Amino acid sequence: MVLRWMISAVCLLVLCGCSNRIAEFDHTTLELEKATDFHEEVDQKMVDESTLVTEVINMPAFGGFGLFLFPSEASFYGEMTLDNIDALLPYHSHIDTDTTVEVINTLLELSESGETLFYDIYTDVEKEEDISKENTGMFFFKGEEGAPFAIISAGGGFAYVGSIHESLPHALELSKNGYNAFVLQYRTGGADMACEDLAMAISFVFENADMLGVSTEGYSLWGGSAGARMAAYLGSYGPAAFGGNSFPRPAAVIMQYTGHSDYTENDPPTYACVGENDGIANWHRMECRIRALDRLGIDTEFHHYPNLGHGFGLGIGTSAEGWIDDAIAFWERHME
């Protein structure tokens, strides 16, 4: 346990000290290229808990965006395997290896069947004008043709994006229920840039709905921790307030464990959940915001789970397990 916390602390210092992400990416790319030389036979085989993180990132199926499966701000992966990624996710807990493996294998199967796994949200010109936008985009888990969509943003304190634990598994579950789910890879460094990326993601889906095969009616925004702040801000003020186009605000916002307190009288219906032992997002504070929305006549649902801390994701094996089914049901009530 002490070793794990020491590793996490070192990881966090590395993350917080990042001032030049592009240089860092170049360093990581060199490491990954070496890994590719060592693991030549990585094509479309399935992964398991012993598969190296670098091997997954370099799989041809992921076409260069495999780095976004894991916190890409990390400057090292070494011999890290899929059953030992906790050090990459210092703000997260209860990381379930079986879920990690299922997510990656599902993406490999989708690639094998010809599905597009990742979409850019910025044009090449926009990326040239602001090179930080290179590190953005969305994974896509396709549901039923013409079904509503959700965009999920993982947390990480705006220092890293914990998608492998806090948004990719959620998207997989939503797609199993027939819904189209996008996982946002946003820029780290602060809420403003992250919200701009979410606004652009919403605009991208609306503008390409026919190509993507999704309905823009009754969409939802999901997020955990920092990602929940993003979902809440876009729910309160809409994409135009953050540089996107004037598209509707979501039909529902699904939030996990955040101390976000801002709200408006026009907020969408909001589902929220948190652990009672959360030392980052106090559950009483989260409840205060939900009760304020209640008083405004906004439909809400709030759950707090015993013996549970911050960053539990799907909460597999915890008192929160199954919360996502409640959240889906809440969203479904507000789709029309």
Predicted features, each with a name:
Residues 60, 66-145, 191, 195, ...:
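N-terminal cap/lid segment of alpha/beta-hydrolase-fold proteins
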Residues 162-164, 183-212, 316-320:
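Catalytic nucleophile-loop/oxyanion-hole region of alpha/beta-hydrolase
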Residues 268, 282-292:
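Short alpha-helix in the alpha/beta-hydrolase fold that links the catalytic acid
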Residues 163-182, 291:
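Short amphipathic alpha-helix adjacent to the substrate-entry channel of hydrolases
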Residues 200-267:
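Primarily recognizes the serine-hydrolase "nucleophile elbow" in alpha/beta-hydrolase
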Residues 22-26, 31-66, 296-336:
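C-terminal catalytic histidine-bearing segment of alpha/beta-hydrolase fold enzymes
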Residues 147-156, 271:
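Short beta-strand element of the alpha/beta-hydrolase
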Residues 272-274, 278:
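Short beta-strand/loop motif that positions the catalytic acidic residue
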